[in-house]
Swiss-Prot record:
Entry EC no(s): 3.4.24.-
Family as reported in the entry's similarity comment: In the N-terminal section; belongs to the AAA ATPase family. In the C-terminal section; belongs to the peptidase M41 family.
Transmembrane segments: 155-175
Origin superkingdom: Eukaryota
Cofactor remark from the record: Binds 1 zinc ion per subunit.
Cofactor(s) demanded: Zn(2+)
NCBIfam families: FtsH_fam
Protein name in the entry: ATP-dependent zinc metalloprotease FTSH 2, chloroplastic
Broad class of where this protein is predominantly found: plastid
Span of chain positions assigned to the transit peptide in the UniProt entry: 1-32
GO MF assignments: ATP binding; ATP hydrolysis activity; ATP-dependent peptidase activity; metalloendopeptidase activity; zinc ion binding
EC class of the enzyme, as a word: hydrolase
SMART domains listed in its UniProt record: AAA
Length: 676
């Protein structure tokens, strides 16, 4: 018996889906000239020839050096210095030739191992000492010193050996540079390592997104602003004649799934001018300075194709308020933002470029980015109302088949808080269910199951009869009774024992309209209704038998009561806003930096006021359960038998035992009631 669904101020936030993309942006193919191909071929042939000559010449040079050594009498046989002294003492040395300043000696000596034949050996000397020279003179041995002689081949060999690696390195870098700049792959091709600073924006000279303003519904005000921008691009003389200038930027602000990107696709398809699109996260890379370089490159290309439109999706990835990052003023993201600010409205200006950006976190954007001159217009794209939801359902339902019992107006009334993406997902889920069940059209049953699945989760296995099922039934009926009998509460739409997600049972409440202003009576009534499940458990089964099933209910009503005290000023403390604006921000850093402006005494008063509201609401819930015990038993009996009761069925049974408040009465024919 998990949290009960109670549709408080609005529906619980839903996982949103992105509208299907309408096409892939085409990338222009760069074709190099034949002359450039010939030049590159010549360079490659020259490099191959040079490397080939080097490969052939190295063995030749090595052979030449070996021959030169042999001419100088350098033997491959070696003799140790101690053995040389031994041969010298035994008068076996005949001749000594000294090389390299007396450190190398080529010795002609008589070798007993070779039958007293003369052998030429090489001896490494520790140095030409006077004692050794004196000894050579005493033995009357012929010795001579030779200077180092190098021919031109040896000089060339040493020169090539010293310059080979630098030349190969420089040549490789040169080839990489030519490939990156000469069209051999472009920014995403094989030459890309040197193209990090290039913009990754998708460019379309004649955008073909497949989306027009006719495909956008439910956001009429935002659509009107964009239609003016398109009109300005197509017929600028109508506006310049009265001194108007084209807006430099339009910022789309709204929750996820409300159609911000869809509006950008529509303006791209309607404007008829070059269109650049990029995500804010594509500016920042792992290398320092890449983000600012990409911003410069993007606006350089935009100026070359002006007038044009630049669309930056999720601009909060790069436009976050400065000074809140870990890196401080040297943060790479801040450098990118500074360059973006300069390009949008700096000394040079960007005449003819309209920047359109979208975000769902406008509260964390830098104030310099939001000022007029950069983003002249801020268009709010909010969750649609009943009329907007109806228009959106008509757009997404145009290619689907519905049974005669399905009304798009009824679906719109049953889905408060749904965004455009949620409604598109709803109809798609209903179509999938209809196909799975072998139907040729979508019925109200598929619509009902799809709404339940989106809001509460997958349908689980129904519980077998027993104490747990009875406890869940009393818990859910307690919610329904307390909500229906408390003035100002939303009407019951459905009570069910079919598990969904983590909930063992569900009670659905649905507002009769879309309330933009909620009164204190309505908020307090929702707290009473939320505590009805725990009150029913305590009255029916006793205080020791209350369960953890009300954990989600308690979390919701505690948060609502705290909002009444801290945010809305609906308590005995007075009409104060007791929450720092920074603490309400969606940014974690800004919440950490927010100053706690309340004293310990005030914090204690807030806790007392929240507890007073909860206790008062719980006493009312207990009283309503005690007073309507007979009605509760009857409703639970029917619910255990049918497992699901519609709002009309529930109110019909309850009205037999007690009178429903006038403001909570719902006509039986209301569109909010579900088919049984």
């Amino acid at each position: 018996m998990a949290p009960t669904s109670m549709s408080l101020a609005a529906k619980t936030p839903l996982p949103f889906s992105t509208l299907p993309s309408s096409g892939v942006a085409q990338r222009p193919v760069s074709v190099t000239a034949s002359l450039e191909h010939k030049t590159n071929d010549a360079r490659r042939k020259f490099l191959k020839l040079a490397l080939g000559n080097l490969g052939v010449g190295l063995p030749t040079l090595l052979g030449a050096k070996r021959a030169l050594a042999e001419e100088q009498g350098v033997s491959s046989s070696r003799m140790s210095y101690s053995r040389f002294l031994e041969y010298l003492d035994k008068d076996r040395v005949k001749k000594v030739d000294l090389f390299e300043n007396g450190t190398i000696a080529i010795v002609e000596a008589i070798s007993p191992e070779l039958g007293n034949r003369v052998q030429r050996v090489r001896v490494q000397l520790p140095g030409l000492s006077q004692e050794l020279l004196q000894k050579l003179r005493e033995k009357n041995i012929d010795f001579a010193a030779h200077s180092n002689q190098e021919d031109s081949g040896s000089l060339l060999f040493n020169l090539i050996g010293n310059l080979a690696f630098p030349l190969i390195l420089i040549g490789g870098l040169f080839l990489l540079s030519r490939r990156a700049q000469g069209g051999l792959g472009g920014p995403n091709g094989p030459g890309f390592p040197l193209g990090f600073g290039q913009s990754r924006a998708k460019f379309q000279m004649e955008p073909n997104t497949g989306v027009t303003f006719d495909d956008v519904a439910g956001v009429d005000e935002a659509k009107q602003d964009f239609m003016e921008v398109v009109e300005f691009l197509k017929k600028p003389e109508r506006f310049t004649a009265v001194g108007a200038r084209i807006p430099k930027g339009v910022l789309l602000v709204g929750p996820p799934g409300t159609g911000k990107t869809l509006l950008a696709k529509a303006i791209a398809g309607e404007a008829g001018v070059p269109f650049f699109s990029i995500s804010g996260s594509e500016f920042v890379e792992m290398f320092v300075g890449v983000g600012a370089s990409r911003v410069r490159d993007l606006f350089k290309k935009a100026k070359e194709n002006a007038p044009c439109i630049v669309f930056v999706d999720e601009i909060d990835a790069v436009g976050r308020q400065r000074g809140t990052g870990i890196g401080g003023g040297n943060d790479e993201r801040e450098q990118t933002l500074n360059q973006l600010l300069t390009e949008m409205d700096g000394f040079e200006g960007n005449t003819g470029i309209i920047v359109i950006a979208a975000t769902n976190r406008a509260d964390i954007l830098d104030s310099a980015l939001l000022r007029p001159g950069r983003f002249d217009r801020q268009v709010s794209v909010d969750v649609p109302d009943v009329r907007g939801r109806t228009e959106i359902l008509k757009v997404h339902g145009s290619n689907k088949k519905f049974d005669t019992d399905v009304s798009l107006e009824v679906i719109a009334m049953r889905t408060p808080g749904f965004s455009g993406a949620d409604l598109a997902n709803l109809l798609n889920e209903a179509a999938i269910l209809a196909g799975r069940r072998g139907r040729t059209a979508i019925s109200s049953k598929e619509i009902d199951d799809s709404i339940d699945r989106i809001v509460a989760g997958m349908e689980g296995t129904v519980m077998t009869d027993g104490k747990s099922k009875s406890l869940v039934a009393y818990h859910e009926v307690g919610h329904a009774i307390c909500g229906t009998l408390t003035p100002g509460h939303d009407p019951v739409q459905k009570v069910t024992l079919i598990p969904r997600g983590q909930a063992r049972g569900l009670t659905w409440f649905i507002p009769m309209d879309d309330p933009t202003l909620i009164s204190r009576q309505q908020l307090f009534a929702r707290i009473v209704g939320g505590l009805g499940g725990r009150a029913a458990e305590e009255i029916i089964f006793g205080e020791p038998e209350v369960t953890t099933g009300a954990a989600g209910d308690l979390q919701q009503i505690t948060g609502l009561a705290k909002q009444m005290v801290v945010t809305f000023g609906m308590s005995d403390i007075g009409p104060w806003s007791l929450m720092d604006s920074g603490a309400q921000s969606g940014d974690v850093i800004m919440r950490m930096m927010a100053r706690n402006s309340m004293s310990e005494k005030l914090a204690e008063d807030i806790d007392t006021a929240v507890k007073r509201l909860s206790d008062e609401a719980y006493e009312i819930a207990l009283s309503q359960i005690r007073s309507n015990r007979e009605a509760m038993d009857k409703i639970v009996e029917v619910l255990l038998e049918k497992e699901t009761l519609s709002g009309d069925e529930f109110r019909a049974i309850l009205s037999e035992f007690t009178e429903i408040p006038v403001e909570n009465r719902v006509p039986p024919a209301t569109p909010a009631a579900l088919p049984a």
